[in-house]
Amino acid sequence: MTKRSTPSSPQSRGSDLKKPGGGWPIPAPGDVLCYAYLWAREAAQGQEEGLKDRPVVVVLAATDTGSGIRVTVAPITHSAPDEPADAVEVPAIVKRDLGLDRERSWIVVTEVNSFLWKGPDLRPLADGSPYYGAIPDWLFVRMREGIGVHAGRGRVRIVGRTE
């Protein structure tokens, strides 16, 4: 049985980012994490580790009986997409609220990484947590719709990460 989590807002996650004993809460769709993302092109070349730690947006966090929590994330990049429909731009105010830089950024909707929580590729920020915060619900919906359109055409590459 799979249990899906729902989008959270930055306000609802802010006070709950660290659990007693140093554990991190299970991420919710829309949460933004620091993660060593492995691009599909890198995985195709045989790489197993992402070359750069970057913000990623949680697309899905699902409980699989016996396996744990499987988390799917989409990368945020400074590179503008070749095709506008391949990414969703992150507004400057959202980047500011997350504590990200001022450069233009996009959420890529044509590929994702999938891993068992808390995989080895999460990267703690200054506060010891990998959480930047969460994107607004309306931006999450745009990202999810973009992924859905590409998935319907068989154009979303899923890179499974080592546990």
Model-predicted segments: where are they?
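C-terminal terminal-subdomain/extension
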Residues: 1-17, 83, 90-163
